[in-house]
């Protein structure tokens, strides 16, 4: 796959950045609709986004570099080069959510009211963003047979044929899962007014899909012999179940 979308003068604009930008833009459009459902301020949401998005990019890069520091030890300037990938979504989520929490606390706004609205947009951005991995020929799984890959569209087959070998299109598996979760979260946002349910459902469902898909990947970040993404996913599932249970229990009490 050609990772370059187009050139502006001598500057090569990569598909990776273009696709992330498209995901962010469509996420904002979806948030406009979801703010109306929850009667939340879209202006406040935009302010929140302007803080969360750059924080998430920084967090995603920092998280990746921490676990892959040996690749940057001899050339530290490359830490700042994100154009070819090297963003870990878990780091982005952690830093983005933390930045939003601090901002909304300062603004004296309800944290869960806005992250509930944001959850479908976040997972939509993730679903679209995975296609950036496709154009970078990264985040794929282990080798597969030609017979297996032949079940996929021709352009997927070509993109997953890397250096003479076909690979699992794990980016596609996760993209499809994330789109399904997005649709469910929009539905849930309409059906429940309990603050925190939608956001914690996002954490749990994304983590569930990521846990299984991560097991197929060949480029996982490791902590010893443990895949970091699977460890974080297990914690996310437990956290989600715990919070949703307590939110429902608290509502029943009153």
Swiss-Prot record:
Keywords assigned: Cell membrane, Membrane, Transferase, Transmembrane, Transmembrane helix
Pathway per the UniProt entry: Protein modification; lipoprotein biosynthesis (diacylglyceryl transfer)
Pfam family, one: LGT
Ligand binding (a 1,2-diacyl-sn-glycero-3-phospho-(1'-sn-glycerol)): 130
GO cellular component, one term: plasma membrane
Primary residence: membrane
One GO term (biological process): lipoprotein biosynthetic process
Domain of life of the organism encoding this protein: Bacteria
Plastid keyword on record: no
InterPro entries hit by this protein: Lgt
Keyword check for Ribosomal protein: no
Membrane topology, as annotated: Multi-pass membrane protein
Molecular function in Gene Ontology: phosphatidylglycerol-prolipoprotein diacylglyceryl transferase activity
E.C. numbers: 2.5.1.145
Record family assignment: Belongs to the Lgt family.
PANTHER family in the record: PHOSPHATIDYLGLYCEROL--PROLIPOPROTEIN DIACYLGLYCERYL TRANSFERASE (PTHR30589:SF0), PROLIPOPROTEIN DIACYLGLYCERYL TRANSFERASE (PTHR30589)
Function field: Catalyzes the transfer of the diacylglyceryl group from phosphatidylglycerol to the sulfhydryl group of the N-terminal cysteine of a prolipoprotein, the first step in the formation of mature lipoproteins.
Entry protein name: Phosphatidylglycerol--prolipoprotein diacylglyceryl transferase
Taxonomic lineage of the native organism: Bacteria, Bacillati, Bacillota, Clostridia, Eubacteriales
